């Protein structure tokens, strides 16, 4: 599979011979959906706490006598049927949202995403990317010269501090190391800018 490599002016400079296993795979929507949902589920933390009927504070006195009032039987105002009572199935911080995806499925799913990005011309490869100083203006000028304004994911083989600092104030741009690339980020951004060394890292991890 040949990928187009651009220069800093956004013009095609060369072709990169990439792995067909990683960039020439058919798109499997069901598999991609599964790994995206699993990734999001595994990122969840149990941060909600509700009380059941044994945990709410309430009197133990029976609200009214069992018979003779014409009203329904009631034994406690901590009942889930009552306002202020406990929940029937309360949320707990101990809930486990994790979903298991085996390595083979994950690799296949990432390959399907990268292949589809390449087919849709949303994957752009550059020889290397850096900025001279941690200035957002310098970074935005560089992206503009490459014609890559807008919703953009930038992936490098190693995190460049100047690149990271100059991009973190941009709401539509995210800079990641290759080993931090995840399915949610890859499908979310309109364009993905990848360095040649990052492509090699992808092939090493998922190829």
UniProtKB/Swiss-Prot annotation:
An example Gene Ontology CC term for this record: ribosome
Chain segments carrying region Disordered: 43-94
Domain of life: Bacteria
UniProt keyword annotation of RNA-binding present: yes
Positions of transmembrane segments: none
Keyword Transferase annotated: no
SUPFAM superfamilies listed in its UniProt record: Ribosomal protein L4
Biological process annotations from GO: translation
Basic and acidic residues composition bias: residue spans: 45-58
Keywords assigned by UniProt, alphabetized: Ribonucleoprotein, Ribosomal protein, RNA-binding, rRNA-binding
Gene Ontology MF terms: rRNA binding; structural constituent of ribosome
Function: One of the primary rRNA binding proteins, this protein initially binds near the 5'-end of the 23S rRNA. It is important during the early stages of 50S assembly. It makes multiple contacts with different domains of the 23S rRNA in the assembled 50S subunit and ribosome.
Family matches, as NCBIfam families: rplD_bact
Assembly with partners or alone: Part of the 50S ribosomal subunit.
Protein family according to the UniProt entry: Belongs to the universal ribosomal protein uL4 family.
Name of the protein described by the UniProt record: Large ribosomal subunit protein uL4
Gene: rplD
């Amino acid at each position: 599979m040949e990928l187009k490599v651009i220069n800093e002016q956004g013009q095609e400079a060369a072709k990169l011979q990439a792995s067909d296993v990683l960039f020439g795979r058919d798109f499997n929507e069901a598999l991609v959906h599964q790994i995206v949902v699993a990734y999001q589920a595994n990122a969840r933390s149990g941060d909600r706490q509700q009380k059941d009927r044994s945990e709410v504070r309430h009197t133990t006195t029976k609200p009214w006598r069992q018979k003779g009032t014409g009203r329904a039987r009631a034994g406690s105002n901590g009942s889930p049927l009552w306002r202020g009572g406990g929940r029937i199935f309360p949320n707990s911080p101990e809930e486990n949202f994790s979903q298991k995806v085996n390595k083979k499925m994950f690799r296949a799913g990432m390959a399907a995403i990268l292949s589809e990005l390449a087919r849709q011309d949303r994957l752009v490869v550059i020889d290397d990317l850096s900025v001279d100083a941690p200035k957002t203006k310098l970074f935005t000028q560089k992206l503009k010269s490459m014609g890559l304004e807008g919703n953009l994911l930038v992936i490098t083989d190693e995190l460049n501090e100047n690149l990271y600092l100059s991009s973190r104030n941009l709401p539509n741009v995210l800079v990641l190391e290759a080993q931090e690339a995840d399915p949610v980020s890859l499908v979310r951004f309109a364009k993905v800018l990848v360095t040649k060394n990052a492509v090699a890292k992808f092939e090493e991890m998922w190829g």
